[in-house]
UniProtKB/Swiss-Prot annotation:
<dbReference type="Pfam" id="PF00128">
    <property type="entry name" value="Alpha-amylase"/>
</dbReference>
<protein>
    <recommendedName>
        <fullName>1,4-alpha-glucan branching enzyme GlgB 2</fullName>
        <ecNumber>2.4.1.18</ecNumber>
    </recommendedName>
</protein>
<dbReference type="InterPro" id="IPR006407">
    <property type="entry name" value="GlgB"/>
</dbReference>
<dbReference type="Pfam" id="PF02922">
    <property type="entry name" value="CBM_48"/>
</dbReference>
<dbReference type="InterPro" id="IPR004193">
    <property type="entry name" value="Glyco_hydro_13_N"/>
</dbReference>
<comment type="function">
    <text>Catalyzes the formation of the alpha-1,6-glucosidic linkages in glycogen by scission of a 1,4-alpha-linked oligosaccharide from growing alpha-1,4-glucan chains and the subsequent attachment of the oligosaccharide to the alpha-1,6 position.</text>
</comment>
<comment type="pathway">
    <text>Glycan biosynthesis; glycogen biosynthesis.</text>
</comment>
<keyword id="KW-0321">Glycogen metabolism</keyword>
<dbReference type="InterPro" id="IPR044143">
    <property type="entry name" value="GlgB_N_E_set_prok"/>
</dbReference>
<dbReference type="GO" id="GO:0005978">
    <property type="term" value="P:glycogen biosynthetic process"/>
</dbReference>
<dbReference type="GO" id="GO:0004553">
    <property type="term" value="F:hydrolase activity, hydrolyzing O-glycosyl compounds"/>
</dbReference>
<keyword id="KW-0328">Glycosyltransferase</keyword>
<keyword id="KW-0320">Glycogen biosynthesis</keyword>
<dbReference type="Pfam" id="PF22019">
    <property type="entry name" value="GlgB_N"/>
</dbReference>
<comment type="similarity">
    <text>Belongs to the glycosyl hydrolase 13 family. GlgB subfamily.</text>
</comment>
<dbReference type="InterPro" id="IPR037439">
    <property type="entry name" value="Branching_enzy"/>
</dbReference>
<dbReference type="InterPro" id="IPR054169">
    <property type="entry name" value="GlgB_N"/>
</dbReference>
Length: 743
C-alpha cells in the first residue's frame, strides 16, 4: 500500500517490503471498502513503522477529511485520503494515545479508533459458552458497556460460526455495513469494541453468509429493543438498577413452611389500556395492577411472555428477543421498577418463558448466519408444524447456553420469582404434531427428545442451585412421568406442573347442563386419582377463553343467574381442590366475551352487582386460602385430603376434607352442582364438635339466593363416609360451601 505525499506514491514500512505484501494489503483494504470479508485488524488501526513511528489507517466512507488528535484535541497529524475510496492514512511520529477527528458532511466527530484496541473478550468465556454455560453467554455476548483502559464504550459480541464476515451497523455509523467489521474469535464468535457508543443507540449485525448474502440481524442477546414493528436492537442503559426489595429476596426460602400459591395470569398489553387503546407502560401498570392484585389477595402475578416478540397476535409466544422485555411497555428499567414494586407489595412475579420454538422472521434467529444455527437443518426436527415456527437444536451446547442464559437473566437481573415454561410437551416428543415418517427417532429409535430432556434438567438444576426458592412451572399436557420429580430420581426437576387434565375434565363438566351432569360425575372425581403424582397447579388460563369459546362465565349453562352461580361454585371448588391456583384476568369478575389481546378487559361490567359479587368471591377465596393452612399445607400430599362424598352422581354432589398436616383445623368443602337445593344432607367429618360455615358461594354478598347453614353446626356421633362423625347440612343450589372445624 502507498500513501500519497505531494502527488507521489511512497511505500511505507508497514506495507511490507515485497510487491506481494503491498498487493495483499491493497486487496484487503479494497475488500473492506467494498464491505467484503477481510481481516480489518490486519490493516486498519495503528501499525508500527521504523523509529517509533506508526501508520494509522481508517475506513470511513463518506468522510470529507480526517485528522489524528491527542486526548486534549491537539492535532497530531492530518490524514490523507488513499486511492481506495473511504480509506484514510496518516503517520504518527511518536507513541502515545490518539483519537480520530472525522469531518462528515453534517458534523465533526471526535472518537477513539476502534481498531486500535486489542480483543476484550476472555477466550475462556467463549470456551464456556461452547460447553453450554448460560452465565458465560450473559457475561460475553450482546452489547456490553465496558472500558478499554479509561475509554468507555460498548463491546458487541455475537455467535455466527458460518459467517464469512460480521459487522456492527447502527445509529453510530449511519447503518453503513462497511464501517465496522468485527474481529473473528474462536468457535465462530465475533466481537468489536466501539468507543463512546451510548445507551439508546440502535444497532444490528450485518452478517455475510457463506454464499455472500448480507443478512441484517437483530442481536440475539439484546437487552433492549425498538418498539415493534421496528426490529433493531438497542444499546441498554449502563447504570445498574437500584433495587429496594432486599427483604423480599431474603425471604424467598425454599425450605420454608409451605405457603399459599394463588396466581393471577395477566397479559400486560390488554389487562387495561389507555384512552387511545394503547398498552399501559410499566409505571402505570404498577400503579393500577399491583393494588388490584393486592385487593384480590393473589400471591403472584404471572405475565404472559413479555420477551420481545414481533407479532402482538402471538400473545408473546413467538419471541425473538429472549433477553429483552418488550418495548411495548417502556424501558427495561421500567420493567425492573414494576417487579420491585410488586415485591414491596408482597407479590411475586412469574414470567411465561418460551424455549420450545421461535418464529422465522428475517431479522431473527432463523438461518442467523446463513445456515441452520439455532434450529435443526432437517425440517423433520427443526420445523414446528402446528405453529409454523422453528425448533431449537437442544443438542448444540451454544444453543442451550443461549436459552439457559436467558432464563438466568430474567431471574437474576430482574429478580423474577419463577418461570412458567411453555409447551414442554412439544419439547419432550420428537413426533409431537407429526405423522408417521415426518419425524426423526432418537439414537435409541424412540420418540423422546433426549436432548430436550437433558436441557430441561439442566435448566431446573441450575435454577435450583443458583436461585433456590425460584419456581419453575411446566406447561406439560401429557402423562410424561416425573415432571416435578427430583432429577436424581429420574425426573425433570420442575417445582410445579400445570394440571391440564383437571382443567379439561372439570371445565367440560361445568359446561354441561346440570341435567346431564349425573352421567359425567367422574369428570369431577377422576383428578383425585393422580392429584398427588406431581406438584400441580390448577390452571384456568388464557387458553380457555379464546377462539370463540367466550369467557368462563359465558361457557356456563343456563340463564344469567345460573351462569353466575355455576362459575362461583366452580371457582370455590377449584380453590378447595388439592393443587395451587391460577386464574386468567377477567374471570375474577365474570367477563362474558372471549379475551381480545388488542383491547382492555370489559371493566364496565363491574357496574353490575353480580360481577362485583364474583370479584368479591375471588377475593374471599384468596383470603380463605391464606388464613386456612388446611387449604395449602397439604396441597401436594395425599394425607392432606380425604373424600367424604365421591359417589353421589345422582345429585351431582361431592364433598371432601382438606387436612393440615401440621395438625391445624380441617376444612370440609361441599359442592352441589344442580339447581336443586338439598336439606338435611348428611356428610361424614373427621372431628367432633362445632363446624363453622366460612364461605358460601350462594351468599347474597356474591349475588346468590342466600341459602345456607346459619353459621355453626354441631356434629352428630354417627359414623359416615369413613369418618366417626357427621354433619346435617343445607346445600344451596349450584353452590360450594366451606365449613371449618372449630377448636
Amino acid at each position: 500500500m502507498s500513501e500519497r505525499q505531494g502527488g507521489q506514491e511512497q511505500r511505507t514500512e508497514a506495507d511490507g517490503m515485497t510487491t506481494e505484501g503491498i498487493s495483499e494489503t491493497s486487496q484487503t483494504l479494497q475488500a473492506l471498502a467494498n464491505g467484503l470479508p477481510a481481516d480489518a485488524f490486519a490493516v486498519l488501526g495503528p501499525k508500527p513503522l521504523a523509529e517509533g513511528r506508526r501508520q494509522v489507517r481508517v475506513l470511513a466512507p463518506g468522510a470529507e477529511a480526517m485528522g489524528l488528535i491527542d486526548p486534549r484535541g491537539k492535532l497530531l497529524a492530518r490524514m490523507q485520503a488513499s486511492a481506495i475510496d473511504g480509506v484514510f492514512e496518516g503517520i504518527l511520529a511518536a507513541d502515545g494515545p490518539y483519537r480520530l477527528r472525522i469531518v462528515w458532511p453534517d458534523r465533526v466527530q471526535e472518537v477513539e479508533d476502534p481498531y486500535a484496541f486489542a480483543a476484550t473478550l476472555d477466550e475462556s468465556l467463549l470456551l464456556q459458552i461452547a460447553a453450554g454455560d448460560g452465565q458465560a453467554v450473559r457475561r460475553a455476548l450482546g452489547a456490553q458497556h465496558v472500558h478499554c483502559g479509561d475509554v468507555p464504550g460498548v463491546r458487541f459480541a455475537v455467535w455466527a460460526p458460518h459467517a464469512q464476515r460480521v459487522a456492527v451497523v447502527g445509529d453510530f455509523n449511519g447503518w453503513d455495513v462497511r464501517r465496522h467489521p468485527m474481529r473473528q474469535r474462536i468457535g465462530g464468535f465475533w466481537e468489536l469494541f466501539l468507543p463512546r457508543v451510548e445507551a439508546g443507540a440502535r444497532y444490528k449485525y450485518a452478517v455475510t453468509a457463506a454464499d455472500g448474502r448480507v443478512l441484517l440481524k437483530a442481536d440475539p442477546v439484546a437487552r433492549q429493543t425498538e418498539l415493534p414493528p421496528a426490529t433493531a436492537s438497542v444499546v441498554p442503559s449502563a447504570a445498574a438498577f437500584a433495587w429496594t426489595d432486599a427483604a423480599w429476596m431474603a425471604n424467598r426460602d425454599p425450605g420454608a413452611v409451605p405457603a399459599p400459591l394463588s396466581i393471577y395470569e395477566v397479559h400486560a398489553a390488554s389487562w387495561r389500556r389507555d384512552g387511545h387503546n394503547q398498552p399501559l407502560d410499566w409505571p402505570t401498570l404498577a400503579e393500577q395492577l399491583i393494588p388490584y392484585v393486592q385487593q384480590l389477595g393473589f400471591t403472584h402475578i404471572e405475565l404472559l411472555p413479555i420477551t420481545e416478540h414481533p407479532f402482538g397476535g402471538s400473545w408473546g409466544y413467538q419471541p425473538l428477543g429472549l433477553y429483552a422485555p418488550t418495548a411495548r411497555h417502556g424501558s427495561p428499567d421500567g420493567f425492573a421498577q414494576f417487579v420491585d414494586a410488586c415485591h414491596r407489595a408482597g407479590i411475586g412475579v412469574i414470567l411465561d418463558w418460551v424455549s420450545a420454538h421461535f418464529p422465522d422472521d428475517a431479522h431473527g434467529l432463523a438461518q442467523f448466519d446463513g445456515a441452520a444455527l439455532y434450529e435443526h437443518a432437517d425440517p423433520r426436527e427443526g420445523m414446528h408444524r402446528d405453529w409454523n415456527t422453528l425448533i431449537y437444536n437442544y443438542g448444540r451446547p451454544e444453543v442451550t447456553a443461549y436459552l439457559l442464559g436467558s432464563a438466568l437473566e430474567w431471574i437474576e437481573h430482574y429478580h423474577l420469582d419463577g418461570l412458567r415454561v411453555d409447551a414442554v410437551a412439544s419439547m419432550l416428543y420428537r413426533d409431537y404434531g407429526r405423522a408417521e415418517g415426518e419425524w426423526v427417532p432418537n439414537a435409541h429409535g424412540g420418540r423422546e427428545n433426549l436432548e430436550a430432556v437433558a436441557f430441561l434438567r439442566q435448566l431446573n438444576r441450575e435454577i435450583a442451585t443458583q436461585f433456590p426458592g425460584v419456581l419453575t412451572i411446566a406447561e406439560e399436557s401429557t402423562a410424561w412421568p416425573g415432571v416435578t420429580a427430583a432429577i436424581s430420581d429420574g425426573g425433570l426437576g420442575f417445582t410445579h406442573k400445570w394440571n391440564m387434565g383437571w382443567m379439561h375434565d372439570t371445565l367440560g363438566y361445568m359446561q354441561r347442563d346440570p341435567a346431564e351432569r349425573a352421567q359425567h360425575h367422574s369428570q369431577l372425581t377422576f383428578g383425585l386419582v393422580y392429584a398427588f403424582d406431581e406438584r400441580f397447579v390448577l390452571p384456568l388460563s388464557h387458553d380457555e377463553v379464546v377462539h370463540g369459546t367466550g369467557g368462563l362465565l359465558g361457557q356456563m349453562p343456563g340463564d344469567d343467574w345460573r351462569r353466575f352461580a355455576n362459575l362461583r361454585a366452580y371457582l370455590a371448588l377449584m380453590w378447595a381442590h388439592p393443587g395451587d391456583k391460577l386464574l386468567f384476568m377477567g374471570a375474577e369478575f365474570g367477563q362474558w366475551a372471549d379475551w381480545n389481546h388488542d383491547q382492555s378487559l370489559d371493566w364496565h361490567l363491574l357496574d353490575g352487582a353480580r360481577h362485583r359479587g364474583m370479584q368479591q368471591l375471588v377475593g374471599d377465596l384468596n383470603a380463605a386460602l391464606r388464613r386456612t393452612p388446611a387449604l395449602y399445607r397439604g396441597s401436594h400430599r395425599a394425607d392432606g385430603f380425604d373424600w367424604s362424598v365421591a359417589d353421589d352422581a345422582r345429585n351431582s354432589v361431592l364433598a371432601f376434607v382438606r387436612h393440615d398436616p401440621a395438625g391445624g383445623a380441617p376444612l370440609l368443602a361441599v359442592s352441589n352442582l344442580t339447581p336443586q337445593p338439598h336439606h338435611d344432607y348428611h356428610v361424614g367429618v373427621p372431628r367432633a364438635g362445632l363446624w363453622r360455615e366460612i364461605l358460601n358461594t350462594d351468599s347474597a354478598h356474591y349475588g346468590g339466593s342466600n341459602l345456607g347453614n346459619s353459621g355453626r353446626l354441631a356434629t352428630e356421633p354417627v359414623g359416615m363416609h369413613g369418618h366417626a362423625q357427621r354433619l346435617r347440612l343445607t346445600l344451596p343450589p349450584l353452590a360450594t360451601i366451606y365449613l371449618q372445624a372449630e377448636k
